[in-house]
């Protein structure tokens, strides 16, 4: 087993602790509902996490020099075990919470956590009119204007450079890139979400939401977001996945029994997912650690965060009102 993962297993036992009650939930709002000041503050905080002087790496995992790089590395490390699997939604719920905690603790962010309401905005107009695609240096994530290589050329992230590959190696820096696709944006439409929300069990719902609503949001933005492993390098990844989590919570809130409804495989099937998983971190590195005693996802399944946050179980993240998550969607 990978040495770093072994250390994380040991750390899990030490991290078990009594949590404070969820009495002051963090607010999550649509990006379009944030004030200009809140948008500026959020963007500034994400840039802070990318700055080694302000947010140096906590562990240096995979050669990371910043907390932002560590966030990306945590995702790359387990691509085959957090996509097209039972843990897809729980893992990303915890990942969104970890990113929020880092923004607040490392960079002093105090505002609401934003999501991209793709359904509302897709109904209102084409992708190029989306509220997130704004070239403002303080209130957007870059416009649809790109250079010949697809690199972002305006907004606050023009100087972002990414250095990780899917084998967790550090490589020559590349720009934050995009490749916009209107036909993929249409896969996030509310009618598709409604079909998912009508499903009765978690496995079916997870498969539905993890299909075109998930991939459509990624591929609509494209470029860095096209890559299933490296996509957290784009700040828009977190707004997209926070919206997916919001939709999962809408489904859960319909029936209390859904707060314990989990299932699915622990390992994504097929060559595609095995091909993007780092060769040094195969199935045998993760399956024993997940604590499911097999390939079926259970509430006891451990969510691994590569040392940037404690590792907790799916049971602890199933309810957004839980002590571990403690959020309110507006």
Please state what every model-predicted region is.
Residues 1-21:
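Fungal secretory targeting signals
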Residues 19-330:
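Intrinsically disordered, flexible peripheral segments
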